[in-house]
């Protein structure tokens, strides 16, 4: 994500330079910050171990956005063993300070450009019906790649223990152009 000039006060037409974010592979040292970002948002918070483990074993298919040394966004993802042409996005987290700037889409696009994702033709994620932001993001991804976004039922709420988890629907974007 490159630095962009933004007008923050239209009356005075003041221009400011927004920070240049670094989009890169995560390291195990980033795992705790990813966990903290998930915990401070409305995301399902997995154990801190999950984030550290994803950084160690799935760094080729995960990405972090940093403002200096601070993690301000991340994606945890993997290539399912039975779907080698698909990148499954487990979680996307964006700090409140970065929301509405297109960082989620930038992270996905940077991720699918990687050598490890050269055979990826589809992006999949599961999204709850109430998560309108993620639904909009995946539809925007499809539009930006001029491809389809198919939505299908995946995990019903009955599969989750307790009664506090919504149904998860699969969003499948693709085929992506090679």
Swiss-Prot record:
Its EC number is 2.3.1.178. NCBIfam families: ectoine_EctA (TIGR02406). Keywords: Acyltransferase, Transferase. The keyword Acyltransferase applies. Belongs to the acetyltransferase family. EctA subfamily. Gene3D superfamilies: 3.40.630.30. The lineage of its organism: Bacteria, Bacillati, Bacillota, Bacilli, Bacillales. Pathway: Amine and polyamine biosynthesis; ectoine biosynthesis; L-ectoine from L-aspartate 4-semialdehyde: step 2/3. It comes from Shouchella clausii (strain KSM-K16) (Alkalihalobacillus clausii). The gene is ectA. One of its GO terms (molecular function) is diaminobutyrate acetyltransferase activity. This is L-2,4-diaminobutyric acid acetyltransferase.
């Amino acid at each position: 994500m490159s630095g962009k000039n933004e007008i923050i006060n239209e009356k005075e037409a003041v221009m400011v330079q927004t920070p240049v974010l670094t989009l890169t592979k995560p390291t195990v040292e980033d795992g705790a910050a990813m966990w903290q970002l998930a915990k401070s948002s409305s995301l399902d918070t997995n154990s801190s171990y999950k984030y550290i483990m994803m950084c160690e074993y799935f760094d080729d298919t995960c990405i972090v956005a940093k403002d200096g040394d601070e993690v301000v966004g991340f994606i945890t993802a993997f290539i399912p063993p039975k779907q080698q042409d698909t990148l499954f996005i487990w979680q996307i987290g964006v700090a409140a300070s970065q929301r509405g700037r297109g960082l989620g889409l930038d992270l996905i696009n940077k991720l699918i450009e990687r050598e490890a994702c050269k055979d990826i033709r589809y992006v999949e994620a599961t999204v709850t019906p109430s998560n309108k932001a993620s639904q909009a993001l995946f539809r925007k991804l499809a539009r930006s790649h001029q491809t389809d976004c198919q939505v299908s039922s995946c995990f019903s709420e009955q599969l989750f223990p307790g009664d506090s988890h919504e149904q998860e629907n699969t969003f499948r974007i693709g085929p992506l152009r090679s």
